[in-house]
Structures are given as structure tokens and as C-alpha cells.
Amino acid sequence: MPTPNLAEWFNDSDMNDTATVGGKGASLGEMFQKLSGIGVKVPNGFTLTTAAFNLFVNAEIPATIWNNIGAPEDIEDLRNAAINCSTLASALEVCLRDADPEDHLNLNSRAALARSLVRETPVPDEIKQVISQEYSKLCELYHPGVDVAVRSSATTEDSAEASFAGQYESYLNVSGEQDIVEKWRRCVASMFTERAIGYHIEHGMHPLDSAIAVVIMKMARSDKACSGVMFTIDPDSGHDGVIHIGSSYGLGELVVQGVVSPDTYTVWKEGLRKHKFPIVHRTLGSKEQMMIYHEEAANEVQSIAVPYEDRRRWSLT
């Protein structure tokens, strides 16, 4: 059996590859392949596949990491049991065994222990080498030290059984191999928040039954204008005759996280095809905040208030 790739570029991924690159990686690959050729600018990038995740969680963990990992008294027995585990996966299994999503205090303690384990476990050299190699290629396509978005892409993110969109972390304006490695590990750790673990259990899944891929893509400077989310069907009714757009100022992360109330537009597809006015409904959002590149700290983003007069304007015209 051939060794699975640890990274896949967008031009090699499509919607048939969700098991390896996750929902976000597959969608971006599909967009890059089908839209770039007709003039739509899709930022290029690659996805660290679920094979990288599996390599990480199945690697041996050094005993020394436990010097930096404590645990509250209510789960001290779990920590002591996990110390005897040889791999990250087996230690995480101990941490999450028989977790009760209704016992929030205990679940919070378990989740904190699981994330500490992930953050303290060394990233295998094979993954570091792949990140270095593929990021160098991305720098050649754009410019040295190119700024990227590091975005979680779960294999269960948009499944029919449950939607995991927004459950896991993404990081913006990241630059340099070492920072990408660390942000990749933080994306993996975000699988083990109290919210994500509880959501898995409530939908009849074990947190380790799914894997996570992580997208590394060129940042689009939408903080200088606007961005948002578009659905090619109505997300509430499932009606496939319309496009639903949510738009706000700055980087799109605040829209994705539900932090801001965006402008919304419902666009009639047939109207577009017939060159008729296609907007059948629109609602002006409050758009109170926007996320931009940090003015002083490199490789950081910040949220600022949107001027009142801009809130009363449409972000898309």
C-alpha cells in the first residue's frame, strides 16, 4: 500500500477527497480548479492531510512532557493513567473515556488535559519537513515570507449527521515555517475543546473517530475592503434557486464565527442567467466590528470598531 501524502495542493484536491483534506480543503480545491481558469482569483495553497494528523497522534510521546502537564484534582486519576500510555492517541483515549457532556466541570477538565497533551507533544520531523517544503513552494509563487491563513478542515465538518463548521480554530496572517508548525498543532488541539468534545458525544461519535486536516493558503487582504460567506443554496430552506451571501467589512473570520451581524443578500440564480436584476432580498447588518491586520504587531490581526457611518452603508454594492 502506498504511503499517503502528508500534503495535497489545491490543484490536486476536489470534493472526492474530503476524507483526506476535509470539507474546507476539498471545497477550496474544487474552487481553485474550476474557477481560476475563468478569471476568478482563488488564493493558492495546500492542505496538511489527515495522514499528518494520524502520524502525529500515533507517534510515541516522550515521558518528559508530563513535567509540564498538570491536572485538576477531579481528574488526577486520568492523568496518572495516561502517563503509562505510549502514544498521544492512547493517552487521549484515556482522557476522554466515559466523558459525560452534561458534567460540564469534569468535561472542561478533561478537555484542558487533552489540549495540553497535544500542545506538549513534539511534532514529528516528517511533518515539519513537509511544511517547510510546501511553504517554500508557496513563497516562490508569491513572495518570501508570504502571509498565510492556517485553517482547520475537519472530515466531519459538513456531514449530513452534524455540522462541525466553526467548531475548530483557524489562524490568520501567519508567516514562517515555525509559526505554521505551531499553528497546525493548535488546530489539532482545537479538536479537544469542551464544546467540540461535547458536540461529538451528543451526535453519537467519539472525538477520536474523526480526523482533522489543516489548510495552508495565501491570505487575501480583504481587511482593506470586505469579505464574507456565500452559500449556493439557501442554508435555511435548502432552496437551490438562490444564492445566499453574508458580507461585512474586513477579514471574514468574524462573519464565520458569528461575532458580527453581516449584510445579507438573497440572489436569484435565474435572474443572473437572464441578465435581470437578481437581488430578491437584502438586509442591512449592524457590522459593529471588523478584523484587520494588526497595525503594530507583525503576523497578528486585531478587531476594531467600524465607524457608525460605515455601518449604515452596504458592504457590497
Predicted regions and their residues:
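NTP-handling and nucleic-acid-processing catalytic cores
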Residues: S170-L272, K276
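Conserved catalytic alpha/beta cores of large enzymes that bind or transform nucleotide phosphates
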Residues: V242-T317
